[in-house]
Amino acid sequence: MIPVKPQIEPADFDDKVRKPGNAWLQAHPDVDPSKYRNFWTDCLEEMADLYSHTCAYLAIFFASVYGADSVDHFIPKSDPINGKKLAYEWSNYRFCCLGENRKKRTKVPPLDPFDPLMKQDSFFINFADGSIYPNPGYDETYKQKCWDTIEALQLDRPECRKMRKKHFKKYADNKVTLDDLKEDSPFVYQEVVRQGL
């Protein structure tokens, strides 16, 4: 995971998502959060374009044709304090692949890729096995936040390790250029550059 620059909400977001969403909530004040009307999907295509079809958590490009685009509510809809208030707010949305959204579920990881305080090099990659770990140069408190984020988002699961290792191998085997890697796998790209590979 690497920091992501938050994009400004689309001009029609208020009319397409926020207003109808909040009106629906007013009409259904006691509904279970899992049943909230998914007006956020009306901004999914624009969100994908604004974030270059790159998952906020895995930092990989994925094409919409696979049907894996999803909107994650960083603060989950089920949050007892802010869930309802943020359910239809652009600032609470993270563009991510569906699989990662399902892994996160209702967890709130300590590190948010949209947070300007998240450090660019929070995580390092061991390309021998594709594993990730906190940058050892940071203090114990920040490193623990990194570990807790890895756990909350399951960023070091076998599939993720395999993916990172595969992306690196394609670059190492000269099957893709550094520019291709930057576009398709920004986190792997960042680590290739940092490690001088």
Show the residue positions of the predicted features.
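The −1 position to Zn-ligating cysteines in a subset of zinc-ribbon hairpins
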Residues: T54, S70, C96
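Glycine-rich phosphate/pyrophosphate-binding loop shared by adenosine-nucleotide-utilizing enzymes
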Residues: Y57
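Histidine-centered catalytic micro-motifs used for acid/base chemistry in nuclease
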Residues: V71-S78
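Short acidic/polar micro-motifs at solvent-exposed secondary-structure junctions
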Residues: Y51
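Extended charged
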Residues: M1-A48, I60-G67, G83-R94, L98-L197
